[in-house]
Every structure is written in structure tokens, then in C-alpha cells.
Amino acid sequence: IKKIIITEDSTEGKKLERLISKYDGKNQDFRLIVNETRLGQLKSIDKAYREIDTEYIFHCEDDWEFLREGFIEKSMEMLKEDPKIAVVGLRSREDCSGIPISKENYMASNGEEYFEILEDVFTYNPGLRRKDVCDLFGSHEKLEGKLWEAELSKFYKERGYKMISFVNPFVEHIGNKRHVHFSKRGKNSVLDFKIDRMVKKIRYTFLKLFGKVK
């Protein structure tokens, strides 16, 4: 790993600096970006991506638990095997049960089994991707007011890209109950989030139908 870029879109910069100081210099190069004023996720992603000078990007948020090692190396091998893979995801079949996925499992040349995500071909979930593929879309800020991942998926699917994920998962989502903009009660279930996502998609479809969003 050449560089670890962390963006903080809150007032917790000092806490992060103290945390990073425990690891900085131990064969890791950290770049901490603390926004002076809150910019939101999309602008924060753009700021981070402007710092990237490597061929590959591993994108991740802080509410994921990693279950085992080796995911970057294995993901890179699979990206090299098929240039039309936009993202190599790390979630299990069961964790992707709410979206269309392939019935079959496939075997990569490195011996890893994987399945294909049929509709949502681009995601902000943990996963390795090529920088040149990310650059095709450009700034993420233009997604403001839209369904981010739906728009990204449409863009990449129209260009023949796909997303795959490992049968034997590398991550587990631990952030459902601290999703700050969804429930003030902090008691969200997985079903709550699926319903919330569905409602947002329906709302966005109607807004697009009546020309409220482009």
C-alpha cells in the first residue's frame, strides 16, 4: 500500500491525528484531509481522489469489519484478469440478497470463487477498483441530489462494466445502527434500511419523471 488517504468531514480531526500517530511511520504513509467546513461525502471523495497517483484505489468507509487478510492482492489479480470489472467487492452472497446477483458462482484463475452483481455494478462499499475506470466518470460532486450508486451503476453498465464479489467474504457491515441521517432512535434494522433505500429509489424515479432532477 503506497498511501492511506483519510478524509474527515466533521470536527474530529484532532482525534484522528492522535490515532494516526500510533501507526504513522510503521511502513505506512498517511494523508489526513480534515475539512474546515462540512462539505458532504461527495466533495470529500473528490478531495481524496485528487490525491491518488496509483493505478488502483481501495475505497472504504469506517463502518466495516474486516474478517481476513489478502483481499487487496486477490482483488488485484482478478481486475488484471478481466478489464471490464469495475469493482471487486468483498461482501457475501447473503449480504447482497436485496439486489440482483448471479445464481452461479465462478472461479477466477487465482482459485477464488466469486459471483456477479447484475445491476449495481458500482458501489462505495469496500472494494478495489482501477483509477482509470474511476476517472471515466470524473467528479462525484455532480451526483448531488441523485441516487449516487444508481447513477454510477447506470454509467458503468452502459459502458460494459460489471462488478463481482467474493463467495468467501472479507468484510461485514457494522454501521447500520449508527447511520446518522436515517433514524434519530438509533434502532435501525437491516429491513429498515432496505425499505429506506426502496423509498428513496421510488422518490427519485418520480422526481426524474417530472423533470425535477436530471
Please state what every model-predicted region is.
Residues 36-51:
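Glycine-rich, basic loop-to-helix element that forms the pyrophosphate-binding segment
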Residues 95, 110-129:
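A recurrent flexible, glycine/aromatic-enriched loop bordering the glycosyltransferase active site
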Residues 69-87:
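Conserved donor-nucleotide/metal-binding helix-loop-beta segment in metal-dependent transferases, i.e.
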Residues 88-101:
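Short beta-strand-to-loop element that shapes/binds the nucleotide-sugar donor at the catalytic cleft/hinge
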Residues 121, 126-129, 136-214:
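C-terminal catalytic/acceptor-binding lobe
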Residues 15, 44-45, 68-72:
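Acidic donor-diphosphate engagement hotspot in glycosyltransferases and nucleotidyltransferases
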Residues 1-33:
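Acidic donor-binding segment of Leloir-type glycosyltransferases
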Residues 55-65:
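Short beta-strand-to-loop acidic/aromatic patch adjacent to the donor-nucleotide binding site
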